[in-house]
């Protein structure tokens, strides 16, 4: 297996065959921006976003260059989420002032394993660091969403909260009841689309068409790539084949992927 964190390095294009959400938004006049409190070079994330949607990438080094943090400042992955949310408010205000469609994508990190990052806002509610961090970050996210809802641009803005993967701190979840189904968190706020059907079995791949659908895009056949629009009644691949079978298929070598995506 290739070292995925080293993919796209040097002069190599990052997944040249991919056509992403960012590119679709760019073609429709959106200003794309990525805000992260770490170095954009990790796993070449910055390169991916710059090549797929012409994102302006505001990372840890950007924060130093713009004097938002001291040159010797380094906490956790770079700087903590408390600062990230403050910088996001400034960035959103600037993007909205242009009078053009915009997309701000953010990555929070305080809740990453192991045990999370204890910031100045954390309270000792539970006597356990990770629980305190999770509660603190939840409050910060809620406060940030409430701030957006008070802004003039909120009327035409969709907010999507999405976890990138399950928490990898397995020891923290060792006392979970048998049969408890852990999932990544997904919430779509202020979309004109509403889903009133049964609970869904879905994967991160389904967020591609679901995000665009939440923005009002029409999706022929309800699918893009390997993802299914969760606002539709079309089964996801996980629902159609089961998670285990889908997992197995995804791990197989794909000539199409190698030729058309990796190129």
What is each of the regions a protein language model found here?
Residues 1-263:
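Solvent-exposed soluble domains appended to multi-pass membrane proteins
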């Amino acid at each position: 297996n290739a070292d995925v964190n080293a993919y796209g390095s040097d002069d190599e294009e990052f997944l040249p065959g991919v056509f992403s959400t960012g590119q679709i938004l760019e073609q429709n006049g959106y200003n794309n921006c990525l805000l992260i409190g770490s170095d954009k070079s990790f796993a070449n994330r910055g390169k991916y976003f710059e090549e797929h949607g012409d994102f302006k990438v505001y990372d840890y080094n950007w924060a130093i260059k713009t004097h938002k943090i001291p040159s010797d400042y380094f906490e956790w992955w770079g700087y903590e989420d408390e600062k990230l949310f403050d910088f996001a408010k400034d960035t959103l205000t600037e993007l909205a002032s242009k009078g053009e469609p915009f997309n701000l994508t953010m990555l929070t990190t305080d809740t990453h394993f192991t045990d999370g990052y204890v910031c100045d806002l954390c309270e000792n509610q539970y006597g356990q660091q990770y629980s305190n961090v999770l509660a603190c970050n939840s409050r910060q996210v809620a406060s940030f969403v409430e701030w957006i809802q008070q802004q003039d641009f909120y009327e035409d803005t969709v907010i999507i909260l999405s976890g990138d993967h399950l928490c990898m701190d397995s020891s923290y979840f060792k006392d979970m009841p048998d049969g408890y189904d852990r999932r990544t968190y997904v919430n779509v706020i202020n979309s004109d689309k509403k889903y009133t059907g049964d609970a869904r079995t879905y994967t991160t791949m389904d967020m591609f068409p679901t995000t665009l659908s939440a923005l009002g895009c029409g999706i022929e056949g309800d699918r893009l790539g390997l993802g299914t629009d969760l606002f539709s009644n079309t089964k996801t691949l996980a629902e159609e084949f089961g998670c285990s079978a889908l997992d197995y298929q995804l791990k197989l070598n794909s000539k199409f992927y190698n030729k058309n995506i990796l190129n």
